[in-house]
Swiss-Prot record:
SMART domains: Sm
Composition-biased stretches (Low complexity): 102-117
Protein purpose: Plays a role in pre-mRNA splicing as component of the U4/U6-U5 tri-snRNP complex that is involved in spliceosome assembly, and as component of the precatalytic spliceosome (spliceosome B complex). The heptameric LSM2-8 complex binds specifically to the 3'-terminal U-tract of U6 snRNA.
Keywords: mRNA processing, mRNA splicing, Nucleus, Ribonucleoprotein, RNA-binding, Spliceosome
Primary site of residence: nucleus
GO molecular function, one term: RNA binding
Region (Disordered): 83-117
Domain Sm: 2-76
Natural source organism: Dictyostelium discoideum
Residue stretches of biased makeup (Basic and acidic residues): 83-101
Keyword Ribonucleoprotein listed: yes
Name of the protein in its database record: Probable U6 snRNA-associated Sm-like protein LSm2
Amino acid sequence: MLFFSFYKSLVGKEITVELKNDLSITGLLQSVDQFLNIKLKDIKVNEEDKYPYMISVKNCFIRGSVVRYVHLPAEDVDVETLQDHSRLEAREQKKQNKQHQEQTNQKSSNTTTTTTV
């Protein structure tokens, strides 16, 4: 959820999305969802000669699973806040894993097996 929240804060900013098929699209971030699907408006393809059919496209929806990189303007990235939230999320995940492990151990100790001879 960290990156989802981070991308939501960038709505309205210009970003470049590089796809796994080497197509790079620059546009204004209109929306992003929990699957990191991205909706861009006023797009420009970085290599118009290579992708001439994309010249007439003005808006696009990009499935999150086809994204290789998202290039962001440096001035829009608050690195300290991002690092703090990353640490907090990692700490919470570690705590949840520990609780899950304790529950699993407790269940296995409550289960008894009997054998008859």
